[in-house]
Amino acid sequence: MAAAAVSSNPRTVEEIFKDYSARRAALLRALTKDVDDFYSQCDPEKENLCLYGHPNESWEVNLPAEEVPPELPEPALGINFARDGMQRKDWLSLVAVHSDCWLLSVSFYFGARLNRNERKRLFSLINDLPTLFDVVTGRKAMKDNKPSSDSGSKSRNGTKRSIDGQTKSSTPKLMEESYEEEEEEDEHGDTLCGSCGGHYTNEEFWICCDVCERWYHGKCVKITPAKAESIKQYKCPPCCAKKGRQ
């Protein structure tokens, strides 16, 4: 059937990424510019429907492939059934998540014969683009400035004390409009203050304990950005108390 037809057989990293980008553009249009048309086509009264993105940048709502196993990995089945049981934005977000998964599965199906470095390069190219979920939900993704576990102590400490987004060279950049400049908050969004339990926000100064690696609001532990610069190794109040008991 048309939905399962493959118009190309990409083999190199560049060809596979081009295929990914075209399919992604198609799905993105269905979920944004053509969203009213897409929404109306996903009638819950119809049979199991899938959203397909094709290499020619066209999208299609259709029944799944009849052959088993299908020629390509299939997108999520029955996206139409949940349409009227959810808020529109939540349903579109759900479709976007499943569509992101499908795009990856198709790309790595084509990339089955790639070697390790080629797969890594392919994923890097894909990862540089915002996901459909990012775009549909308006979620801002920000750069990963969280230090790796094997980074040097100076760099690690400097970064940990610089989450206030000020002008030090090791600090994260302030939020900007482009996707490439907006990935830090996504990384730290689930971080909770070890004192008050509040969520991380980019507007406040945070500091990380070098012993237990918990994060704290500077105001909760009475540490200012200026004071943090003079501390070689920061220990949070619980760690200081623990050492005192020992």
From Swiss-Prot:
Signal peptide: none
Chain positions of site Histone H3K4me3 binding: Y200, W206, D210, W215
InterPro entries listed in its UniProt record: Alfin, Alfin_N, PHD_AL_plant, Zinc_finger_PHD-type_CS, Znf_FYVE_PHD, Znf_PHD, Znf_PHD-finger, Znf_RING/FYVE/PHD
Gene Ontology molecular function terms on file: histone binding; zinc ion binding
Modified residues (N-acetylalanine): A2
Places the protein is found: Nucleus
Region named Disordered: 140-190
GO CC annotations on file: nucleus
Zinc finger (PHD-type) in chain: 190-242
Entry-linked Gene3D superfamilies: Zinc/RING finger domain, C3HC4 (zinc finger)
Gene Ontology biological process terms in this record: chromatin organization; regulation of DNA-templated transcription
Chain positions found as N-acetylmethionine: M1
Entry coiled-coil feature ranges: none
Annotated SMART domains: PHD
Key words, A-Z: Acetylation, Chromatin regulator, Metal-binding, Nucleus, Transcription, Transcription regulation, Zinc, Zinc-finger
Composition skew (Acidic residues), residue ranges: 177-188
Family: Belongs to the Alfin family.
UniProt remark on domains: The PHD-type zinc finger mediates the binding to H3K4me3.
Assembly notes: Interacts with H3K4me3 and to a lesser extent with H3K4me2.
Protein name as annotated: PHD finger protein ALFIN-LIKE 2
Organism: Arabidopsis thaliana
Organism placement in taxonomy: Eukaryota, Viridiplantae, Streptophyta, Embryophyta, Tracheophyta
